[in-house]
């Protein structure tokens, strides 16, 4: 997914100080951000002009101590055609020489009131998520009690219908049919809908419905962490399904593994309620409460007491 300079302006902390529509269309190709401290001294041997250049109090103070001529020369070297944007933190004053260099090299300038370190973290996090490689999977992504649950299964098993029932029960739809997933870091998956399918659900026999229009803004969510996967499959008497919850299965997406639960589907089962319980049970395990272990402890204790009685 490409990110353009104009996309940064959607962040409430940034305002445009220099640059026309053409400059705002420049692509940002890396999430790395440069703090051009050494460059201010004239050392450009390992300069990376393709990065966003972020100027904070230290860089600005050094720059302002220079003569107007030297300041202009340094900024001309720092502003390159491949530089996507220069950002000024702490709402610092923008010297005339910087505007002149930006005009000559055609580089946009943005400014923010935020501190340099906080601004750097926010922009890096935003770019990491936008520039991360996406993996598309078939399924329905729901936010259930704050847990991101990916519902998968064979075509026609009832994934979208289950998603609709969960929406009616107060949960939120993130994506239906195609879920775009990316690794936010080494252990965290994040999912979002394809833009053309945002807020939409396809129900066989009914067609496409707009969940936001029918159920309101509280029924949808633009993105969510993916914490657990649920796989729906037809009930088979010849197949053994996990009854205690101690059989661990995992789904790997984008190099990150998450737990996956297989749920048999047959007439009379309320699948949406089962998925709710699965989400709450997973959260309980994350908080250190494992019903399976408690059952095993009770069973072991009962067996021990029975053995004592027989002795």
UniProtKB/Swiss-Prot annotation:
Residues 201-210 are annotated as: Important for the catalytic mechanism of both phosphorylation and dephosphorylation. Disulfide bonds: none annotated. Coiled coil: none annotated. The keyword Metal-binding applies. It catalyses: [HPr protein]-L-serine + ATP = [HPr protein]-O-phospho-L-serine + ADP + H(+); [HPr protein]-O-phospho-L-serine + phosphate + H(+) = [HPr protein]-L-serine + diphosphate. GO terms for molecular function: ATP binding; magnesium ion binding; phosphorelay sensor kinase activity; protein serine/threonine kinase activity; protein serine/threonine/tyrosine kinase activity. Residues 264-269 are annotated as: Important for the catalytic mechanism of dephosphorylation. Its EC number is 2.7.11.-, 2.7.4.-. It comes from the Bacteria. SUPFAM superfamilies: HprK N-terminal domain-like, PEP carboxykinase-like. Transmembrane segments: none annotated. Pfam families: Hpr_kinase_C, Hpr_kinase_N. It is an enzyme of class 2 (transferase). InterPro entries: HPr(Ser)_kin/Pase (IPR003755), Hpr_kin/Pase_C (IPR011104), Hpr_kin/Pase_Hpr_N (IPR011126), P-loop_NTPase (IPR027417), Ser_kin/Pase_Hpr-like_N_sf (IPR028979). Keywords: ATP-binding, Carbohydrate metabolism, Kinase, Magnesium, Metal-binding, Multifunctional enzyme, Nucleotide-binding, Serine/threonine-protein kinase, Transferase. Its cofactor is Mg(2+). ATP binds at residues 153-160. Belongs to the HPrK/P family. The Walker A ATP-binding motif also binds Pi and PPi. Homohexamer. This is HPr kinase/phosphorylase. The gene is hprK.
